[in-house]
Amino acid sequence: TGSVYNFVPIGNAADNRRALNLLMEGNEKKVININNNIHIDTYLRPGNNTTINAGKHTITSDKGVIINDPTAASYTNFKNLTINGGIWKNSSSSGLAGTMMRISYASNISINNATVYTNYKGHGIELISCSNVVVNNCTLKAQGKCSKTCVEEQLQIDLSSPTTAPGLYRLSKKLCNGTPCKNITVKNCTIQGARGICANFAGAGNEAKYRKARNYHSNITIENCNVTGISAEAIALFNTKSTTVKNCRITTKTPKSRNSYSVGLAVAYQKGSAPKATTKNVISLTNNTVKGGQQGIFVRSNASKKLGTVIVSGNTVSAKKGKKNAIKVLSAKKVKITKNKTKKW
């Protein structure tokens, strides 16, 4: 069963953080119960096999709240972290313009019933090169002012490259080898940001070597979520070869003049060499209510290969640009578009 600790705040923010980190470090199985509102000065650094039960208590940090520093480019480098509950926020009312929870090279991660506040320029949760992650019944909400051109997401699903993960690059260049995420599930969540949820891709130029088939995310599931984008897409899944988005309310408030940023739900391969176009790679978008600008749902490949199977079924989809622009699927090997309601918004 491991050790169980009931944490009591012991003084100032730095002392609280040090004491919690002493309880959380190491690989043995442990449960930390946070039974009070607490103030910390910077990130908590849990070890493997850690459960944090924060209930309805508020954890306020002068920086971010959860981070791990990987020592090897392996999904199993950090494992078995569960966070239950908690209202996690920065001490500034406009939130942290950075990442609140950054988890990298990790597997078997579970974040449940947590509320995370972050500035529009930041990320509530950033998953870099992770496998087998569940984010369930969480609220991720941006704070402060959102610029008209902000494209940062509250939930970021990332690969490890020098530009996508500069924090890892500072730790070790070996950590930035382009490892993608796989088996990521987001369910029963409410997410609002400049972007809501984004699966990221590496930039052009020097980063082109991270735009290969091996760098593509896979098995991303978004289910029963309410996701809103204020100045970019509500959901944008780039370089993701297999995904399921179902039973979600997806709304982009971005004006249609922002073109592709105003799409409600976007799935796109970016320029580069993509995975082989096989019907086994399925993009399934079903039973969602989607509101967008230029398009509601937009699926396409700008890469060397087509997408695999694309299913768009049972959705109610609106586009500010008109009914005929509600759903657009381009460049897929097999396409099934059925039983959708489309309208002008």
Predicted regions and their residues:
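Acidic Gly/Asp/Thr-rich repetitive segments characteristic of extracellular carbohydrate-active
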Residues: 5-33
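Glycine-rich beta-solenoid repeat tracts in large extracellular/virion proteins
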Residues: 42-46, 60-77, 95-105, 123-129, ...
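Leucine-rich repeat
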Residues: 77-79, 108, 219-221
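Polar/charged side chains located within well-ordered beta-strands of beta-rich proteins
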Residues: 16, 33, 53, 68, ...
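N-terminal extracellular ligand-recognition/capping segment immediately after the signal peptide
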Residues: 21, 28-70, 88-92, 114-116, ...
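Leucine-rich solenoid repeat scaffolds
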Residues: 309, 313-345
